[in-house]
């Protein structure tokens, strides 16, 4: 049953990625496309991760849904959240809220650029600073590849946000697959040939990784150390 669920989730994710690729066809080449999809997926993930963390009561940010809080009120929890999570996102800059306003935001490119800058800056001084530094550098919201005018670029960005927003990623803990890892592998496989590369240059095949994991854990109930000799 687990394998069936895994394949269903993987197929659904692949269809969603292909739908976004179809929407952006002729605008962004495959090698750049992966940066936009993965960057948007990560933006959604950390937004939802932060909201879930706060709304579950793991930090006191008031008795309300964090996504619906005023930025001014949320600021009171910034220091504690950066210490706990390594980053901070204002409610107005969460993925769900930016996406909700995207179609009517004539300056969506500037909005996303500002949001990404704020996320990276929020991690400064924390243990996660190096992880967030330059995180969205390859996500060029002003690239002519998205369109010849700001309006056309924003139109593509709206489609990108909606495409990722409609992905059924659910709760990470409830999924049998690593959505981000699987999306990365799928994107590499889709577009590596266009860049004169092979997907295997960037990741070991999933089947090989799963086989080695099974062989290495046969008869074991606990794992103390892991050595990956084919890690990329």
What residue spans do the PLM features occupy?
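Short, compositionally biased segments
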Residues: 209, 231-232
